[in-house]
Amino acid sequence: GDDRISRINVANIKRVEILNGAASALYGSDAIGGVINIITDDAKNVMQVSSDTRYGSKGRFSEAVNADFNQGKFGSYTSYQRLQADGWQLNALEAAYATDKETKRKYRNPEKDKATDKEASTAFYSNTVNQRFTYAVNDRLTLGIRGTYYNWENDRPASVYKYNMEHETYTYGAGAKYMINKSAYIDADFYSDNFTSRYDSVSKPGEASRGKDTRKKVHYYNGSLKGIFKLGQAQKFSVGMEYVKETLMSATDDLDGENMYTMALFLQDEIRLWKNFQAVVGLRYIYNEFFKNYATPNVVLSYKWGDLNFRASYASGFRTPTLSQLYATDVAKTTDMVTIPNFNLKSEKSDYFMLNAEYVHNRISFSVSGYINKIRDMINYRGIDPAIAEQLGYGKHNEAQQRDNISRAEVKGVKAVLNVYAGAGFSVGGSYHFMDTEDKTTQEPIDKSVKNVWTANARWGHRWGLYHLNVNLNGRIQEGRYSKTYYYDPAPGFSQWDLNTRHSFNL
């Protein structure tokens, strides 16, 4: 949340690892559906400077510059990223809706569509600066400090919107890693993320600008201490603790500083019971200031038979409501719908089961997975009478809804992935993902869910002396997306194909 993905410098990404299913035992409260690990690359040379520039249609531009230095015990890693794009429309008409007298549900009424200047993607720009220093005190102890500054602002048509949005973030952190021996180390880390969102008033010709108003501020603090211990050749044990504190301030909701803290203890044991059989068992104990005690276990059993790998896993998920869900109000300007907070929300909980089989042999790999995720106390929206919201002091609006634990949900799916290395620098791959979702309260699909998704990719790379060329083709085909937010009018299916080339010169 809060634009954190936008701050990642894609030029620094070494690889991306996706962990499907609940992973709260190691990754904490928010890991109820899955985890994406983004591993960045560190320079190994004394000096390494790189620039990555991309330009596309609709004014899409990105520039990423890295400057890394290593000298003796000292290391410095600096990066800057600029992203920007023009705005564009997918449709010059604004969708109109009518209400069914019997069901009271709204439905599309294309005959009433009106011309609009609204954009599917608004013009924007962002800047991100990262700096990290490391110092190796000796062969065992390494220290590090880091910081980030990020800003983002969009530019929307004044004929439609009264304001633009502006986001600003600064982060700072410090860490230490101590190698006990070659098989064990202790890692300590502290991190702070400070986010501010503002309204930037848009003035039409002849109008005076109202300036900028702070929408909300979020302060996040995370401290952790963990140890990793290899016990012989067949076992690795991890143990640690974590403390998280969050603060929310909002001028529009008259919040001077609502706080919530969470403490956690976690442990995980990875053990090879015999040559081809491995087990991973983990547990995370959580104490939250508002939601008290909870424990999330996870178990993974894997067996290797020649080129085949089999895996079965279970994981418990747990997610506490955010401070915004507990305290903040949100108003959709286009529909004049107010969303009011709920101080009595409960934490979401889930049970995730997965079976996986994988074949890996030389130039080909194929895997198929089946899973089921059962979610309890799912936080969703419950429609309420706008008059009630007005009586509670949230103003007069056309529509109103409140966050509430109204759903039990179940997500079942099958995913198949194929990758082939054809030789001579060529590789191709593809996947198919079927997902069946159900809100057990209404017997309807989960909002925003998609049932069928196909992906395909083809890559080729070749080096001529100092010059290296990479060509990548990526495609995605997706069925329509179910949506009750937009009055049960599903977003249409689509296909998207991206062709990218990368040209590298090693001087």
What would you call each of these model-derived segments?
Residues 68, 79, 123, 136, ...:
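Conserved C-terminal beta-signal and adjacent last beta-strands/turns
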Residues 1-20:
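Short acidic/polar hinge/loop motifs at secondary-structure boundaries
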Residues 134-151, 167-291, 297-304, 364-371, ...:
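Face-selective signature of the C-terminal outer-membrane beta-barrel domain
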Residues 233, 272-278, 372-374, 395-484:
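Gram-negative outer-membrane beta-barrel transporters
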Residues 71-74, 136-140, 179-183, 230-234, ...:
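Outer-membrane beta-barrel channels and translocator barrels
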Residues 16-17, 36-38, 473:
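Non-catalytic regulatory/gating segments with a bias toward low-complexity or hydrophobic composition
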Residues 25, 44-46, 54, 66-165:
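Periplasmic-side early beta-strands and strand-to-turn transitions of outer-membrane beta-barrels
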Residues 161-179, 216, 309, 316-376, ...:
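Outer-membrane beta-barrel signature, preferentially recognizing the C-terminal barrel domain
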